[in-house]
Design a protein with these regions (language model features):
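Rhodanese-like catalytic fold shared by cysteine-dependent sulfurtransferases
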Residues: 1-6, 10-15, 22-65, 74-136
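Short, surface-exposed ligand- or partner-binding patches at beta-edge/loop junctions that are enriched
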Residues: 68-69
Length: 136
C-alpha cells in the first residue's frame, strides 16, 4: 500500500489503474489512469481464467509498477495481493479516490499560498524601491 504522495514521488514509469466503475472514472480520475473495473479485473485474474490472465499479462508489463485506485482503498488491496502473487510490483493507494481528492485539494491550497507569498514579496520589493527612490 502507498499513499497518493508516494505515488507522485515515485518518478519511475508506472501504470495507474482506476478500478472504479466507468461512470465514476469518466467524472474524474488521476492523470494518466486507465480504467479497468475491479470485478472484471478479479475475473480476468482468476487462476482458471487462462485467457483473462493472458490478456492481463500481455497488456501490463511486470517491469513497471502498478498502482491501483478504488473508492476507499479496500478493493484495491485485494487486487494488490493477487498481482503480487503473479509477480507484479503492485500498490493499493491508501484511502483510494477519497485520499486522492484530499491530496489534490491540499496541493491547490499550497499553490495558492505560494502565489500569495510571491505577491507579498513582490509588493515588499516595490515598496523598498519606492523608498530608495525617495531618499536618493
Amino acid at each position: 500500500m502507498r499513499t497518493v504522495q508516494q505515488l507522485y514521488d515515485d518518478k519511475r514509469d508506472k501504470v495507474i489503474i482506476d478500478i472504479r466503475d466507468k461512470e465514476e472514472y469518466d467524472k474524474e480520475t488521476m492523470d494518466s489512469a486507465v480504467q479497468y473495473f475491479w470485478e472484471d479485473m478479479m475475473n480476468d485474474l482468476k487462476m482458471d481464467n487462462i485467457s483473462g490472465r493472458e490478456k492481463f499479462l500481455n497488456t501490463y508489463s511486470k517491469k513497471v509498477p502498478i498502482y491501483l485506485l478504488c473508492y476507499s482503498g479496500q478493493k484495491s488491496e485485494e487486487l494488490e495481493d493477487t498481482l503480487e502473487q503473479m509477480g507484479y510490483e503492485a500498490y493499493s493507494i491508501d484511502g483510494g479516490f477519497v485520499a486522492y481528492l484530499k491530496w489534490k485539494f491540499t496541493q491547490y491550497i499550497k499553490e495558492d499560498e505560494n502565489e500569495n507569498a510571491n505577491e507579498v514579496k513582490d509588493h515588499v520589493k516595490e515598496i523598498e524601491r519606492s523608498i530608495v527612490k525617495k531618499f536618493r
